Amino acid sequence: MSYLGVGVSPGNVPVYHGSNLKVIDKRVRLAELVLRCLICGLGVLAAVLVGTDTQVKEIFSIQKKARFTDMKALVFLVIANGIAAAYSLLQGVRCVVGMVRGSALFSKPLAWAIFSGDQMMAYLTVAAVAAAAQSAVFAKLGQPELQWMKICNMYGKFCNQVGEGIASALLVSVSMVVLSCISAFSLFRLYGANKGKDCTRW
């Protein structure tokens, strides 16, 4: 079997488009590319803001330095956003290559791989933001019952920069969730294309 002279393996599905579907497909691809670029940029920004954040405070003639490594949740946040940025960069390159080639065929295994990867990145970034946000609340408000003091009263600059990093990471996680929905749409429309093709045969 062939489509426009191109061999089609069982794992590949020719996607037939009407004029309206072509416009939708183009918009979906563009939205995916924009989101991946946004995630890459914000992920790097979040990792840099948190990873380079330090502040030295002198307490009773003793200098104490606050680093992001003092809180494991912030270490997790830096690693997660670094991974998300690298992943989005690779997927962004794939999107650009696909848009330039304008391929009519789409591989189901590739679609599943992209969908699974986006899902994992979404869970990873959301978990990292949740953990970092909880730690930030403790640092800001303290926990009197456990005699945990308000760290941000002493390390104001450090906390402000961490807050900016968490805000960037939050945008990354939200964008990743939206992107996982787009990849789900791109995957399951292939099965819809197969169903529509079978109906036309009858």
UniProtKB/Swiss-Prot annotation:
The answer to keyword Transmembrane helix applying to this record is yes
Keywords attached to this entry: Cell membrane, Membrane, Transmembrane, Transmembrane helix
Stretches assigned to the Cytoplasmic side: 1-29, 94-109, 186-202
Stretches assigned to the Extracellular side: 51-72, 131-164
Source superkingdom: Eukaryota
* GO CC annotations on file: plasma membrane
Which residue ranges does UniProt annotate as crossing the membrane? 30-50, 73-93, 110-130, 165-185
User: Coiled-coil annotation: which residues?
Assistant: none
Pfam families linked: CASP_dom (PF04535)
Topological category with respect to the lipid bilayer: Multi-pass membrane protein
> What InterPro entries does its record include?
CASP/CASPL (IPR006459), CASP_dom (IPR006702)
Subcellular location per UniProt equals: Cell membrane
Fill in the subunit field for this protein.
Homodimer and heterodimers.
Please report which protein family the annotation says this sequence is part of: Belongs to the Casparian strip membrane proteins (CASP) family.
Q: What's the protein called, per UniProt?
A: CASP-like protein 2B1
- Source organism of the structure: Ricinus communis
